[in-house]
């Protein structure tokens, strides 16, 4: 039997100020010790691709909660932002912390078919990884401190390995940059083609290819600063919403009768 666990309110911060998404009820099918419901407060952090999350984010036995809301604002927000199947909304809880690390706790809200669900990010495995990395660094530090002149060959081998790792890292960085640019081009192309279809512009029309190309080039020029930073290795990405708004604006301009 489902039971209401709590109600979540979280804040969105934007150019026009803050907006609070209210009355998100979290329900569970699992029995819980507490019979009272609480109210959680949170802050929107970012959107994520669920398919690209690290394996440690979700454990196999973690609870997934159903989300409901009677708020028209909340319903409209989730409908707009969770149209993509693999998209998730990361919320940092203001009044709840991870018991092990005493760091902020996080919820990820996502849509599964027609249902709205959420789960709390499991930081247990991450802490284990961090502990192992710290231990390994300490052991490496002790080993380096005890290296003598007779062990100089080990230093030479280590330096050679570090150079190889540096080369691999540079290759990986270039591949990552190319992937981001390719993703930008693919998303931009789909948005333009979709926008042309919505306007009833068929590819049989004489100026179809010309309209597609000038829209593509103009969108690239609009986001030239972001693309330049991406080419320099920045982790920045051009958001889907920003690119969609650019394409819509350009198509309205170019298709005026």
Curated annotation (Swiss-Prot):
Coiled coil: none
Cellular component annotations (GO), alphabetically ordered: cytoplasm; nucleus; spindle pole
Signal peptide feature range: none
InterPro entries xref list: Sld7, Sld7_C, Sld7_N
GO biological process: DNA replication; regulation of DNA-templated DNA replication initiation
Keyword annotations from UniProtKB, A to Z: Cell cycle, Cytoplasm, Cytoskeleton, DNA replication, Nucleus
Parts of the chain that traverse the membrane: none
Cited function: Required for the proper function of SLD3 at the initiation of DNA replication. Binds to SLD3 and reduces its affinity for CDC45, a component of the replication fork. Required for mitochondrial morphology.
Protein family: Belongs to the SLD7 family.
Complexes and interactors: Interacts with SLD3.
Protein's UniProt name: Mitochondrial morphogenesis protein SLD7
């Amino acid at each position: 039997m489902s039971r209401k666990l709590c109600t979540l309110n979280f804040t969105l911060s934007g150019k026009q100020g803050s907006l609070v998404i209210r009355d998100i009820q979290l329900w569970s099918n699992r029995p819980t010790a507490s019979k009272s419901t609480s109210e959680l407060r949170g802050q929107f952090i970012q959107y994520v691709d669920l398919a690209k999350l690290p394996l440690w984010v979700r454990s196999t036995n973690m609870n997934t909660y159903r989300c409901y809301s009677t708020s028209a604002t909340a319903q409209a927000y989730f409908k707009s932002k969770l149209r993509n199947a693999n998209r998730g909304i990361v919320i940092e809880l203001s009044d709840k912390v991870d018991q092990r690390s005493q760091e902020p706790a996080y919820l990820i809200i996502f849509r599964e078919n027609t249902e709205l669900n959420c789960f709390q990010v499991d930081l247990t495995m991450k802490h284990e990884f961090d502990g192992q990395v710290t231990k390994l660094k300490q052991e490496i530090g002790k080993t380096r401190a005890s290296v003598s002149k007779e062990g100089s060959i080990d230093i030479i081998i280590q330096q050679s390995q570090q150079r190889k790792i540096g080369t691999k890292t540079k290759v990986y960085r270039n591949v990552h940059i190319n992937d981001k640019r390719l993703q930008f081009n693919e998303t931009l192309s789909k948005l333009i083609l979709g926008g042309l279809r919505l306007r009833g512009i068929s590819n049989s029309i004489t100026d179809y290819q010309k309209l597609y190309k000038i829209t593509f080039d103009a969108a690239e020029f609009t986001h030239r600063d972001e693309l330049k930073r991406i080419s320099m290795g920045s982790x920045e990405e051009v958001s889907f919403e920003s690119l969609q708004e650019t394409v819509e604006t350009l198509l309205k301009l170019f298709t005026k009768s």
